[in-house]
Amino acid sequence: MKLNYSLLTILIFTLFSCENENSDSNELDPAEEVQIELGKTNQTIEHNGITRTYVQYVPNSYNHENPTPLVINFHGNGGDAQAYADSTGDFYQFHNVSESGKFIVVYPQGVIRVKGAAEWDPGDNSSTNINDNDLFFTEKLIENIDKTYNIDLTKVYAVGFSNGGMMAYGLACKRPTKIAAIGIMS
């Protein structure tokens, strides 16, 4: 009987030792902590050797403890992400609404293509040229933002103006598990 108590004591000690080692597993190592930036900032991301830019707005109400929805707002053909984010009017400035709606909004920059204007290419699922396919870029953008912020991946929305609306449609049709809903402004 004494042997059983000794084994039980060793087992309990081992279990508590394991728990203590792993109890902080969800906390970031201070050396690995990421900088949370609130408000409107300009960001970059590398995608297939190309530096892509986007404007990001994180509301002051952001709380890393709570999963947060993400809205991706695509500009139209010939547009500019910075100018689009700064535009005024009823259909613009999603970042103002994000304060009360408690969501993060990003305005990615399209790529200058054949026509000499920044545009979106929703591509084709069978396309092997992922440099010309903004579906892959958008997936990487979502993953990149989720590494820094606590994104609710079931609440990622796409909205777009004109060619940006076509991009939102492309995401809804070709990446339905990544996008919860879309909105088209023109």
Model-derived regions, located:
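Bacterial Sec-dependent N-terminal signal peptides
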Residues: M1-L28
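A domain-start/cap signature at the N-terminus of enzymes
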Residues: C18-L70, D90-Y92, V97, G101-F103, ...
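Active-site glycine-rich loops that stabilize anionic/oxyanionic intermediates
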Residues: T68, H75-G79
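The serine-hydrolase catalytic nucleophile loop
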Residues: A81-Q93
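Alpha/beta-hydrolase active-site loop
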Residues: S126-Y149
